C-alpha cells in the first residue's frame, strides 16, 4: 500500500499533540492517537519510569527477551497493523521524556520476528524517539513464510518502512512537532534492512548504520547451507569436532597469522592478509595426535574457500581465518544451519527438502527466486547520496556467521558500479573493519562502540569518537565524517569491571599500524 493510504488508515490526528513537558506521565497515559481504522489498532499506551525492569510476557519465548531494563522515563506505544488479509505487523514506539528531536528506526536479526527491545531502550536513553517491529511474524522460525508472500513482504521490506512512517507520525502527534533528523540502527539482517531502505525508501532515514550487513541475502543463505555437506554430520568418519576447531585449528590460524600486524595479541587485524595453510596440521609418522587426517585437511580447505556456482561465478566469498571460535558453534556443528534449512524448506522449496542434499544448483534456484527482491545487492545508491544521506557500515573481522569479506566485497562493488574512487564513495558511505569482533558484538577485540543495546555498547559515551551512532549524528548534522571509531573491550565484557583494552578502528581501505602507535594509514 502507498504511504499516504497507510497514514489515512492509521488516522493520526496531529491536532491531538500533547503538551508533554508539563506532566509527562499524565500526558503519556492520556495519549490516544486515533487508530480506529480496521487495519491499525492501538494495543496499549503506558508510561514507563526510569529504572523499570520491563516485563515482556507476550514476547515469543524464542526471541529470548523476557524483560528489558529501561533507564529513562518514556511513553510506550504498541500498535498492531494489518498489512493484508493474511499478514500483520506489531510495532512499538518508545517516546522518551528527554527527546532530542531525533528519530531512530531499528532492525531485526536472522530470519526472526523479534523486536530488539535492547535497541529501543538504547535509543530512548540517548534521546531518540525510537521504533521497532516484529518484522511481520513472531519468533525465530521461518515457518510463517511458507506459501505466504505477504508475510515475506513484511519481512523483506514492508515492516520496517511502514513502522518508520507510522513511528514518525506518532512522534509528531505526541511531542507536537516533527522530528528534525531520522536515523537507523541495525546489524546482520538489520544491516541488510538498512541498505535496502537506502535503495527503496531513501527519504526514510537521514543516516543509516548497517552493521555486518546480510547483503546478497540469497547467496548468504546458500553459503551457510553449504557447510553441512562440507563438514558432514557429527557421526561421520572425518567429522572435525567443535573443540578441534576452537583449540587446534584456531591456535594454528593464530600461529600463522596473528603477528602479521606486528602484535602477538590473539587478534588478526586484517584477515585478508592471512593465507592459512591447513596442511601444517596434517598427521605424519612423527605426529599422530593433535593433527588432522588428509580428508580433514581438505574439509578445512573447503571451509576457507570461496563458493562458486555452476558457471564458475562467485556466489559468496570465503570465511575469514580467525572466525573459528564462533563459526564452530554456528556452522561447523555437524548439523544444518537452521536459518538456511528453514529458508529452503519454507521459502525456496517445501518442508520435505533435505539440507544434506544441498548443492550449488540450489544456490541458483534460491537466487533466481529472489522473493520480494530480498537479495539486496544494489549497483547504485545515488538517490540516497543526492538527498544527503550518510551510511556507516561495520563488520567484525572474527565474524563466524557472515564472513567479513562480503562487506569488503560490497564496498568494492559499490565503488565499481557507481564509478567512484574510495575517497568519493567515502563522502557518503564509510566502512569500518572491527578487528577481534565476532558477529555484531563480543570477541577478544575492542568491540564495544555504541552499536546497539547490549550492556557493553550501551555503556559507550555518546560522542563521535567512541560511539558509532553519535558519529553518524555528527556526520549528518554537522558534516563531521568519522575517520576512526574507538572501540572498548571491558574486563569479562562487563563495564562494571573496568576497561581491558581500547583500540581505534580505521575506515576501509585504511589500515591500523601498530608499529606507528596505532595510527591509521
UniProtKB/Swiss-Prot annotation:
The active site is at 188 (acyl-ester intermediate), 399 (charge relay system), 439 (charge relay system). It comes from Aspergillus flavus (strain ATCC 200026 / FGSC A1120 / IAM 13836 / NRRL 3357 / JCM 12722 / SRRC 167). InterPro entries: AB_hydrolase_fold, Tannase/feruloyl_esterase. Pfam families: Tannase. Glycans are attached at residues 13, 53, 85, 98, 138, 235, 419. PANTHER family: FERULOYL ESTERASE B-RELATED. Ca(2+) binds at residues 258, 261, 263, 265, 267. It catalyses: feruloyl-polysaccharide + H2O = ferulate + polysaccharide. This is Probable feruloyl esterase B-2.
